[in-house]
Amino acid sequence: MKLSPTLGQHPSHLVKAIMILLISFGSVGVVGGSFFLKKAVSSSNQPEIITDTSRYKEIRHQLWFSQDEIKHFPTEISVGVENVRLAYSPGVSQTGSYFQIRLKKSPQQIQQLLTQYRKQARHKYRGGDTNVHANLPNGVPTTFFYTGETTESFPPSYEILVLNAEDKGRPGFKWNHGDSYGVAIDSSASEIIYWAEKW
């Protein structure tokens, strides 16, 4: 007795072609899907940095979580203020957040602000950045020059006045977490930078 060939015993060329096509599309789908998934995950790990000065009021009054840390910031940017620069990052996951606004003022206003903030400052530095300041004897973390054009470190013409710095790290991990805020003033350029950091 002879058995007649069926699809189960001898698949036709058409079935083989369909199987190859399905496996190929499945592979492309897996590779493509993993690419887009990786892009979505990696882009969500990058902190958003906002530099649009028109969003200052929103950041100042709604987005920054601790109003005590920015109570020294202006409530709004006056019309006609020149050379305003802003840098805000809400931070994600393990990165810290920061907020800086850089303003040009009249020399008289700068002198008044310098006198006012020198009296309030708990720590004072000349130029540098947070890494330099934190590693000085009795130093505290400050900020980087986020609103600068070329460097992350303040030039020596800037006086960095720390109004408060709070260590929230665990024993043995000094300054692992914390916050600091203050101003950086360049009298020669008639500029003031209001800053706050949280990590």
Region spans (language model):
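N-terminal export/targeting and maturation segments
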Residues: 30-109
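Generic structural hydrophobic/aromatic packing signal, biased to beta-strands
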Residues: 1, 81, 101-103, 183, ...
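Mature extracytoplasmic domains of secretory-pathway proteins
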Residues: 75-80, 85-161
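Short N-terminal helix-initiation segments at or just after the protein's N-terminus
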Residues: 24-26, 34-48, 120-132
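N-terminal Sec-pathway targeting helices
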Residues: 2-30, 34
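Extracytoplasmic electrostatic interaction patches
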Residues: 129-199
